[in-house]
């Protein structure tokens, strides 16, 4: 929050509330609205209008009947998919490397980590949608729920639950304000450095995530689709960020550990620094490393499937 104009130096409780509101802005309804709206367009065009699963199919006959233009648009969509996944793989490799170094004092070239994740993704894709991608995704969610419950139980449980209720109120109260804030009266660089970065990332992932969502949503009504793609993921993100975010904030407010310094110096190790003040530190770290790998493998799988389409 160093670049955020409404930060009050020394007022940790105020800044903590703002931090979670901005986190929910960057990872909540706004981002999933991008996926749900584009995914609904893909689903309607493909299942109701019998068009191909391509971005160009959404732009009307004038584009569809112009083969060079349609091909150019589809190529751009593929390139944005590759760039979006590459950015995520790079950040994921950095966190995996940081975790291995911090917890086990093992240093691995990040390129090797990316190659390893890519190979796992290719194996999963070759096994098919049901045998590979579906089962890996189910394993991924099982591990994620288990880790979330462990942090909630091992961390400051009452504080986390109380804070999440307050976070919900702050987010809903500031929803319109945050959605329309353009820094018109500030000379800060927060929006360019954070909000625009996150939303650009959402848009880069939009073609393949939306197409993937449409492919697995056959037979759903529009109402079911919107609930399942917009509201359910946003709620899951709110819970996830609330549990992990407030566990970290509790440590900062009570001068426990060095997570604040870790975020400032090397953000890739911050998650593992959080675990230092909990029991089962090594277990939590190992589970997190496995989860990071499976998250990025499933993301790569989805991208590969949609690029093939």
Each predicted region: which residue ranges?
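Transmembrane-helix bundle segments that line or gate the permeation/cavity pathway
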Residues: 1-98, 102, 155, 159
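Membrane-embedded translocation segments of transport machinery
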Residues: 67-69, 77-220, 227, 232-286
């Amino acid at each position: 929050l160093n670049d955020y104009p409404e930060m009050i130096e020394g007022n940790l409780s105020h800044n903590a509330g703002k931090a979670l509101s901005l986190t929910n802005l960057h990872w909540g309804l706004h981002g999933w609205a991008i996926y749900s709206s584009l995914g609904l367009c893909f689903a309607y065009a493909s299942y109701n209008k019998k068009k191909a699963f391509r971005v160009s199919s959404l732009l009307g006959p004038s584009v569809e009947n112009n083969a060079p233009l349609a091909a150019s648009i589809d190529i751009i969509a593929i390139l944005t998919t590759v760039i979006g996944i590459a950015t995520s793989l790079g950040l994921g490799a950095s966190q995996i490397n940081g975790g291995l170094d911090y917890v086990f004092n093992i240093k691995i070239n990040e390129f090797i980590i990316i190659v390893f994740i890519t190979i796992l993704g290719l194996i999963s894709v070759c096994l098919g949608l049901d045998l590979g991608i579906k089962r890996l995704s189910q394993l991924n969610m099982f591990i994620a729920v288990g880790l979330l419950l462990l942090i909630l139980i091992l961390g400051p449980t009452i504080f986390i639950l109380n804070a999440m209720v307050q976070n919900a109120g702050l987010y809903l109260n500031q929803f319109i304000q945050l959605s329309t804030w353009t820094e018109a009266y500030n000379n800060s660089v927060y929006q360019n450095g954070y909000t625009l970065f996150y939303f650009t990332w959402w848009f880069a992932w939009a073609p393949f995530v939306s197409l993937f969502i449409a492919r697995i949503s056959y037979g759903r009504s529009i109402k079911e689709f919107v609930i399942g793609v917009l509201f359910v993921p946003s709620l899951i993100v709110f819970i996830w960020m609330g549990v992990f975010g407030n566990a970290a904030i509790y440590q900062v407010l009570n001068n426990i550990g060095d997570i604040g310094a870790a975020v400032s110096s090397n953000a890739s190790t911050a998650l593992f620094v959080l675990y230092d003040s909990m029991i089962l530190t090594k277990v939590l770290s190992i589970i997190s490393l496995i989860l990071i790998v499976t998250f990025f493998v499933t993301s790569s799988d989805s991208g590969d499937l949609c690029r093939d389409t």
